[in-house]
Amino acid sequence: MTFTPSLNSGLAVYRRLLSYTRPYRWIFAASIITMAIYAATETGLAALMKPLMDGSFIERDPATIQIIPLLLIGLFVIRGGANFITQYGLKWVARRVVRDLREQMFCHLLALPARYYDQKASGQLLAKLIYDVEQVSNAATDAILTIIRDSLTILGLLAWMAYLNGLLTLIILVTAPLIALIIWWVSHRFRRISRKIQNSMGDVSQVAQETIEGHREVKIFGGQTYEAERFDQVNEQNRRQTMKMAATDAISQPVVQLIAVLGLAGVIHLATRESMLAQISVGTFISFITAMMLLLGPVKRLTKINGTLQRGIAAAQSIFGLLAETPEADRGQQSLRRARGAIRFEHLSFCYEPAKGPVLENIDLEIKPYQTIALVGHSGSGKSTLVSLLARFYETTSGRILIDEMDIQTLRLTELRRQIALVSQQIILFNDTIAHNIAYGSYQQTSKQDIIRAAEAAHAMEFINRLPDGLDTVIGEKGVLLSGGQRQRLAIARALLKDAPILILDEATASLDTEAERHIQAALETLMRQRTTLVIAHRLSTVENADQIIVLHQGQIIERGTHSQLLARESHYAGLYRLQFRHSHEHVSPLSANVGL
């Protein structure tokens, strides 16, 4: 995602970031006001030095001697109160902004098309959601606090110094262009390095996530050394980028302070000349020097905060880049209460990337309500792509798909997907209770009895009742605490509860033992009843009983018919069938033979 030049500027990005504080503008404004009060106390402290020296030590004025201590106490009480309101108020606003940004990003991720996820690593997306947003939080608190409060402090102190002696103040101002030039150079370098750090954090997250999720494969194939080396490589890259920023920060701060001290030394040299001493009092001189010394702290913090600010801007650019991604198209306006289940593919073609050619080409297929259609073919023939287009996970390149004579492009996405249920081999379950997984997407509207009925129809209550917490059992990430057959039955129960008129079975009983398969087949028979069903690479028994078998090869339909009709033709399907039949006699699962049925 590329930004327009205006959006690419740091100021435009930061302005957009600050727009997220608008709902909390009163607390934000109160924090700004207390920043100004805090900054004024710095100038007040320097100003008190003049009457303290002249009135107390030189003139020995009793009134001054009595009031100065009280003024100092009052000054620091005000300073402490202003600091508390500023710090707490800004942190409160910043965490609200972080929450809002994360919610907006997460909702936007849910709306992005499948093609986006095909092109992006999940670790990179997680890094944006977690690491980048935290960098924005720092820019919204520490950076704002330092920029506004310390800038006001510097302006106040300079104004007081100019009031005391304009010539000496001018010497200090001579150093300002040099300091500004250094800060400008550091800002650009910080932002450039920050982008690289964010990318490297995404790489670290991605490698760690893959290794943790695939820990069984890593162990069984002895990949520990390889994964350790891969993680060390991305971790080292992150360290290098971070050290580049640390080096820039470490160099810039002392250089800026050195320039400021040179100005201070020049002022002291000039102020201690006899001609100048005759013009100013001791109190004026001490007050001026105090103001100069108080300047060093804000200048140092402004230089130091630059790294935080640039990291925040770079992170905000990354976040806004994600938010600028186009959500999946949902231009349909029509509703569909419940489809009969008639499906028609007309002259359908599709390609993931134009340069690589079509994955599906000129597909014409009509499916009547309640029919079971089996899609068979070698891996890569386009079976899964075809059903993905039916659910509009991708947009067709040409042609159209109709459900009950309605073009799916005219339907709202929610209406279309409400008509479809999916059961696949790679079941996605969530780290939640069994009940929440069965009623996923509709738990609040579903009674416990409905969940139990769906689980019973899916032959799942048999193992659920043996669990200590029953339906309230938490099944772990991706259902890791359950067996493969148990996860399949929960997926079937989820599809039964949804009660959609169109069902997609994607290798739904592959790689199961005999007992598990018996339960699954019985549950599937219940699930497929009175539904239009598309079966991908299903078990041979289901393929044989299909109303129509569609044979795909290199994205085209090369055969269609019933099981007996296709066998009689002695063509492509018959060859696949004989190959699976031979494997089954060798006690190998037909699907594990990877011939695509």
Swiss-Prot record:
It is found in: Cell inner membrane. Residues 29-311 form the ABC transmembrane type-1 domain. ATP binds at residues 377-384. It is a multi-pass membrane protein. InterPro entries: AAA+_ATPase, ABC1_TM_dom, ABC1_TM_sf, ABC_transporter-like_ATP-bd, ABC_transporter-like_CS, ABC_transpr_lipidA, P-loop_NTPase, Type_1_exporter. This is ATP-dependent lipid A-core flippase. Its EC number is 7.5.2.6. Its main location: membrane. It holds the Pfam family ABC_membrane. NCBIfam families: MsbA_lipidA. Homodimer. It catalyses: ATP + H2O + lipid A-core oligosaccharideSide 1 = ADP + phosphate + lipid A-core oligosaccharideSide 2. Disulfide bonds: none annotated. It comes from the Bacteria. Involved in lipopolysaccharide (LPS) biosynthesis. Translocates lipid A-core from the inner to the outer leaflet of the inner membrane. Transmembrane domains (TMD) form a pore in the inner membrane and the ATP-binding domain (NBD) is responsible for energy generation. The chain crosses the membrane at residues 26-46, 65-85, 144-164, 166-186, 250-270, 276-296. The keyword NAD does not apply. Keywords: ATP-binding, Cell inner membrane, Cell membrane, Lipid transport, Membrane, Nucleotide-binding, Translocase, Transmembrane, Transmembrane helix, Transport. In MsbA the ATP-binding domain (NBD) and the transmembrane domain (TMD) are fused. One of its GO terms (cellular component) is plasma membrane. Residues 343-579 form the ABC transporter domain. One of its GO terms (molecular function) is ATP hydrolysis activity. It is an enzyme of class 7 (translocase). Belongs to the ABC transporter superfamily. Lipid exporter (TC 3.A.1.106) family. The lineage of its organism: Bacteria, Pseudomonadati, Pseudomonadota, Gammaproteobacteria, Chromatiales.
